[in-house]
């Protein structure tokens, strides 16, 4: 397990530790947490009699959803790896959920965006494992700052 704690939480439910609540999962990486989605509420016009672009911007910035890829390793014997892989899938397959950790203090609001499939079995020394790169969409369009408990700040 990593020295940091990684959490996920479905709306209206208690937070769960990603690495321990489903079985034996090891966090590998999470890509896309720093991505900011394209701004949606901007309108521009060009006119032939002007060198300047006319711009309208909404008061509050709204963004398009961004992609996040969460990569995890599932360890244990073959049956345990399969059960852990399925338990996590059953948790995230339907509905929206939050992800955050106590390393970056960034929180994302996510849905499962694409197929969820494991890698071929691999070995680290004598330890068998499978990995999965899980494609997610951040519905906020950017991550928000949070504390260790996941409360937005």
Question: For each predicted feature, which ranges?
Answer:
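Extracellular/virion structural assembly segments
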Residues: 1-153
């Amino acid at each position: 397990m990593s020295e940091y704690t990684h959490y996920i939480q479905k709306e209206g439910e208690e937070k769960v530790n990603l690495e321990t609540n489903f079985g034996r999962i090891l966090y590998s990486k999470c890509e896309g947490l720093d991505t900011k989605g394209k701004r949606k509420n901007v309108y521009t016009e060009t006119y032939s009699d002007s060198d300047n672009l006319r711009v309208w911007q909404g008061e509050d910035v709204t963004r398009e959803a961004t992609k996040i890829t969460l990569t995890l390793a599932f360890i244990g014997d073959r049956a345990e790896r399969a059960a852990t892989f399925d338990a996590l899938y059953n948790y995230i397959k339907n509905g929206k959920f939050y992800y955050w950790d106590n390393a970056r203090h960034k929180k994302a609001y996510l849905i499962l965006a694409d197929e969820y499939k494991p890698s071929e079995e691999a070995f680290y020394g004598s330890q068998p494992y499978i990995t999965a790169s899980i494609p997610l969409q951040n519905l906020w369009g950017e991550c928000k700052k949070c504390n260790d408990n996941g409360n937005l700040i």
